[in-house]
Amino acid sequence: MRICFKHAQVWKDGSLRLADILVSDGRIVSIGDRVSCPTDTVCVEVHNAVIFPGFVDVHVHLREPGFSYKETVRTGTLAAAHGGFAHVAAMPNLNPVPDCKASLEEELRRIRESACVHVHPYGAISVGQKGEQLADLDAMAPEVIAFSDDGKGVQSESLMREAMEQCRRLGKILAAHCEDNSLLRGGYIHDGAYAKTHSHRGICSESEWGQIARDVRLAEETGCAYHVCHVSTKESVSIIREAKRRGVNVTCETGPHYLTFTEDDLQEDGRFKMNPPLRSREDRDALIEGLLDGTIDMIVTDHAPHSREEKARGLEKSAMGVVGLETSFAACYTSFVKPGVLPLGKLVDLMHDAPMRRFGCGTELAIGQPADLTVFNLSESYVVEPEQFLSMGRATPFAGVTLTGVCKMTMIDGKIVWKEETL
């Protein structure tokens, strides 16, 4: 099947240009002015919209196998397509945990059967994500994008050192959820003013940055390619910035909710509960500074769906995690590109170029490349209504917020997997 996108604003080589894109047999075969199309080509007029390379999210929870009442590979990847993502990396907190070849194959089978975007699984660092014994990294290495115990911090320094040594030998990234259990003390939101005023148990910032400091030292000693998940504190940003200055092979990520909301926005509602928690204004400002100076390499969603019942128990008792695949680009475009905090090119780098460089997944808008692309109207605004999500998860702090930037279509390998009625 041939499809030609006509009169489009195309994001290519770091800027927008007016061009046509011809897609044939799943690949881009021509980009330019007045592209000549064979007679059997389906022409799509793209007005008031921009074609981007399909975005890359290296931190999502698809929940399958094991927790299909929260999300499935199918619903999660449909949500990804609805948000403009062509590639997602799936975290290993599943049942069974992908900690060996057999359990990983169960996840891969479901991906092959159900995914409508490209899915790259993580392998677990430890058996059962228990932090006691190293998983079978050698057996999983050919099939996984990286290794992580996301959802849990690796408490043992010796196990983390061993994991880093093995990841370096295998040429794999180790992506760490940094959380010191000894400092949690039953906390579930940031230990700031809101927690004190409303008698909630708080999570101190050191529970995150303390493990990052440990891991950065280990990465420097082992030479491991180290990636820090969902950075949320100002101290974490400072530690990573200094590590980069020393030449440590470290990258990091943060999410739209940490860049947008703070503890000042908290309500007694599970849609404001995630791990790590929403922090202070100073922490949020440090994250934005980290984006601007390159300390923070990429934006991810940490898309973590739960059932309606699990998120209806207030701040104290709700499950930790919010969804984000369907709002991520629009949230960042609205908060940072529209007001001139970030140029559009920087946002594309954070959501496509940088994760592609670091993790090796993603495609360019270029002749000969797979036709993985997304179409956004950057002038159209909408109010976030979670009941319209394609994800099974509905909990988001962006509910009711007006965002600008609507995904009109997503194409994967030349196949349209999401499309609004009109472009």
Predicted regions and their residues:
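A glycine-rich helix N-cap at a beta->alpha junction
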Residues: 109-125
